[in-house]
Amino acid sequence: MTIKVAINGFGRIGRSILRALYESGRRAEIAVIAVNELADAEGIAHLLKYDSSHGRFAWDVRLNNDVLQVGDDNIRLFHQSDISMLPWQELGIDIVLDCSGIYGSRADGEAHLASGAKKVLFAHPGGNDLDATVVYGVNQHLLTAEDRIVSNASCTTNCIIPIIKLLDDQFEIESGTVTTIHASMNDQPVIDAYHKDLRRTRAASQSIIPVDTKLAAGITRIFPKFCDRFEAISVRVPTINVTAIDLSVTVKSSVTVNKINELMQKSAATSFRGIVDYTELPLVSTDFNHDPHSAIVDGTQTRVSGQHLIKTLVWCDNEWGFANRMLDTTLAMAAMGFK
């Protein structure tokens, strides 16, 4: 059965999801039937075809009025600001992938359901009242058919949670801190401009900019036992894609660098294959652009202090890796059936 999906919000993640669907060869499993995006159709088609991070799209992209033609597929375009007015029932939509960055509450999810969708997957963290928050590779097996309004967490949560799980299962984490070194995002100006966050008034290309992050809350959402045991900070750096995460944890077991790297390398080839990767090559951030993994552990940067303090560096393409996990979670939700 082919799952019929609609994408609400066709920005960085929305477009990456559609591109990843075609590049990964999953079109027999998932079909994008519709896109809702306030931007004009010409801009939608142009930015799908040409991308500053991911290059030219290999498929032909054409416009026929408000139909986006990708290869031989026709995708309906809507420009509706009121999600309750979207024709999901008429189109037979199974799952809405909400990538707007605006909607994320249970009420927002219910509006999609009221419009006729069977399930909703948010491409960003949601409230505690959602049916589930999924980090694929870690807890998707807990999904049930009753989970209709789901969050796929965030790109950084998807990056760090598998690594925390591996370290905790093997060495028993006591506490930790996380520093996210994140590529610039579209809420930052090219030159100084007004923003309610005064640090984000500054030009994205000229500074390393500290920003607020809810990553610690995202960790405890997946692992409640770590409540008040993790803290996180985030800085934005003047690159347009790929993020690094500096994870430091204290553990009960005595550890060595070799033990940690052996664990990561083995897990990348077995239990977390396709989710976690491992490298000891002398790479830099741009080398991980367009990488579909949630996390790539840089074994050259693993450190241990006093046998119980671990520091690791983990890379991710914060767009492409997350887009691929959106597809994975979509399939996992569909596998539970529709009520």
UniProtKB/Swiss-Prot annotation:
CDD domains according to UniProt: GAPDH_C_E4PDH (cd23937), GAPDH_N_E4PDH (cd17892)
* One GO-annotated biological process of the protein: pyridoxal phosphate biosynthetic process
Know the name of this protein?
D-erythrose-4-phosphate dehydrogenase
Report the subcellular localization.
Cytoplasm
Binding-site residues, substrate:
S154, C155, T156, R200, T213, K214, R236
GO CC, sorted alphabetically, is:
cytoplasm
Q: Listed GO molecular functions? A: erythrose-4-phosphate dehydrogenase activity; NAD binding
Organism in which the protein naturally occurs: Photorhabdus laumondii subsp. laumondii (strain DSM 15139 / CIP 105565 / TT01)
Family annotation (Pfam families): Gp_dh_C, Gp_dh_N
Tell me if Transport is a UniProt keyword of this record.
Answer: no
Family per record: Belongs to the glyceraldehyde-3-phosphate dehydrogenase family. Epd subfamily.
Parts forming coiled coils:
none
Q: Which PANTHER family match?
A: GLYCERALDEHYDE-3-PHOSPHATE DEHYDROGENASE 2 (PTHR43148)
Q: In which pathway does it act?
A: Cofactor biosynthesis; pyridoxine 5'-phosphate biosynthesis; pyridoxine 5'-phosphate from D-erythrose 4-phosphate: step 1/5
Chain positions of site Activates thiol group during catalysis: H182
Subunit details: Homotetramer.
